[in-house]
Amino acid sequence: MKKYKHVIVIGVDGAGSFVKQADTPNFDRIFAKGAYTYHALASRPTDSGECWGSMLLGVGPDVHKLHNEHVSTYPYPVDAPNPSLFRRIRAAMPDAELGSFCDWNPITFGMVESNLGVTSDTCRDTELIGRICDYIREKKPTFLFTQLDSVDGAGHAHGYGSEKHLQQIHIADEMLGQAYQAVLDAGIQDDTLFMMIADHGGKGCGHGGWSDSEKLTTFACVGPTVQRCDIEEMNIRDLAAITLYALGIEAPEFSETGWTSQVPVGIFADDTLPEYRDISHLAGGVPRISRVQHITEIVPDEEA
């Protein structure tokens, strides 16, 4: 498989699977020929510390032990037994340009080692998106992880799935479009794996529980070698394995007591990838969550 030179992640906190209910023209357009799902399984409990931590570390909360209070208080150890994606990439690619631009700064502070030379920034996402776009155009990063927080704020304030929550997803979709345009402006689209992911959803005005509206989330990716497909089975922690695979970096060996991040079936046409293992007994999902029926709203390929 072609190795990507750039991996860019747009994280939308609290969007869950509500993306399919919102007006998201940029999401629909960008990922129309990509791979996507509205039922990626979050980590349990469905809180930001546990979920973003699983994505960046490739392990479950029972292994990384991170939670909101912890990542807000303690910096991530530079010698932690579970290296972040940034540390794994830096070890394999010493000269890589790495960036972490997060509205919720505990992600960068409490989940990313501080000695890696990662370019970082934090402010409200309405201002941060401009800085993200400038960074993409100017630095053409090898790996950029971003987090937009206002959707989660709208869910807490007005209710997840409410009109105002869905409107904020629409606004985040505009930011997604700006970020993708920056990729085009930088001229790196032919070498970029571009991803969007939500950490969790919500119920009422909160989250942390295990209802479908809290635990099922949105993921989508597009790139030159990405196959157009509805991903049958995925856990949000799989973001780590997808990133390493795209950059041509060997992932750790799968272990139920350690690394449980995998490349979901269908994203890439590569029959050498390991068989996707059912980790529902570890993640708390229904066995083979791919059997859960759902409705997609991706714009069809006009050329198909």
Give the ranges of each region predicted by the language model:
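Feature captures the catalytic ectodomains and active-site-proximal regions of enzymes
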Residues: M1-A304
